[in-house]
Amino acid sequence: MCSSDLKTKIDWIDSRAIALMLLTDSSLKPYSVSSYHRENLKSLTRYRFSRVQKRSRQKSSISRLVTILFPELSQLVPCIHISSIYAMLEELPGASYVASTHLTRLTNIISKASRGRFGREMAIAFREAARTSIGAKIPAKSLELRHTIADVRAIESEIREVEAEIQKLMDEETTTITSVPGIGTQMGAFILAEIGDFSRFDSPDKILAFAGMSPSTYQSGKMISSYAHMEKRGSRYLRFALFNVTKYVCNYEPGFSAYLAKKRAEGKHYNVAISHAAKRLVRMLYAIETNGTLYEVA
């Protein structure tokens, strides 16, 4: 082919080839209303995934900043990522601020945010720890802490709004996926959105391949590896959803719990055992979704 041929317009040839394929291929299906809903669901679930990931990163930043400004705080409460602690740190972003504040003000802040769970005794503990704290007084870090907490609050509001929209779409779906113990609306929606119509796949193994959960094959000459690793080439979103939801199913469904325990007893690493349970879950989901039946605990 000469170089001038590379710039030749062949749109009409492509259009003719596409039209002929659409006319002659009987296996092709029209774009249905259900497909539209699943695409809309996919956009929402992936957006929710990105917001949850960002929230996790921001919470890590808060933990880092608290370690710099008020390291003793994490020893006084089970978790610093709660409303009462956020409320205190937004107004008093550092040990030096907590140490110099009036006890009544501090008590009011944490009592209101915790709905009475934390009171004067906890306020005294916070202030005493702040007065002997080794935390640094860095105004720039304190400002960053306040802004990061505000970011987390905004992201959480966005997540709630997205989850409400996902719930609306799931109410319109004819699915039995949430009948499985451990699969809630959000994770069920995530799986449905990534897989789409289960009937598009000839077998559950095709779904596993689509998720990148099929074992890879290594071959050199006549030697074929018997220690195949997972491919991890498919949809990372579907793989993430399946792995995470499998952990919940193994907690709430006795059959899967026993299966996970069996794999662990065989000496398999926890993550490897979860991957085996995830494959079993996919086969089960394929069966109930294609047959339109509810899951029944054995």
Label each region the model flagged.
Residues 1-298:
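A detector of single, family-specific signature residues
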